[in-house]
Amino acid sequence: MTYTTLVSAAALAANLDHPHWRIFDCRFSLADTAAGYKSYRQNHIPGAVYADLNKDLSSPVQPYTGRHPLPNIELLAAKLGDWGVNNRCQIVVYDDAGGAFAGRMWWLLRSMGHTQVAVLDGGYGHWRKRGLPTTAILPKIAASGFRSYLDDRQWLSANQIETGLASRSIRLIDARTQERFLGKAEPIDPVAGRIPGALNRPLQSNLDRNGLFLSPDQLRRQFSDLIAPWPAERVVHMCGSGVTACHNLLAMEIAGLGGSKLYAGSWSEWIRNKNRPIAGDERTAKSLT
């Protein structure tokens, strides 16, 4: 069986020794960028390799980019090969944040043409609650070859977002918390607020009280109401830096609403240009008076 959105803890546990399965630990903390790797070295799912959001799943920040620019795809493909991934592998990614960081790797692999990738439902916390095995032993990896192509239709630039909103040809959904979206709090970026015309769907809305994804039917109803009358193919997801937005994109895929896109630069790129409009903060309020 091939998994392309979610995989359960039970299914992963049954395939830990499968020769064509590869597991990646994507735990990360924006507040302490070394914390994820430290946690990985202490314990992780057997066979898992650590994929660092900053070092592996992003490229260096530039003056014109957001906080997590997309990685160099050729370099990432080479790393995947070094990590034992080939084009036949079933890949499983996990974190301890409800899929907020693992979703980035899920989306990247799909954009590179590898659809056999799934997020571990419930993440590492659910895995441990079920008493499933963990280890501190680093896996021994035999390098392989991973061929990829880049489907640049899967994300939009800032200029495309401006054009799409002006022409009302896209529906933009922001995965940040409501406080950040409304501009009431901004603990990370230097400017608070939102892109005018965007709607808010905090990623936590996709999970139940146990940290598992809602059912496909529940997600379908909620997203259908949110995006109407736009079709899924006209929906674009954003967040602070193009990472947690992938959670909403994943949720739509689970719901059977495929084809939505990512604004890769997201809010932290948008505010680099002071001429771009923003809403919900003091600067916008002054400009309207």
Give the predicted meaning of each segment:
Residues 1-289:
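Cytosolic catalytic domains that perform sulfur/thiol-centered chemistry
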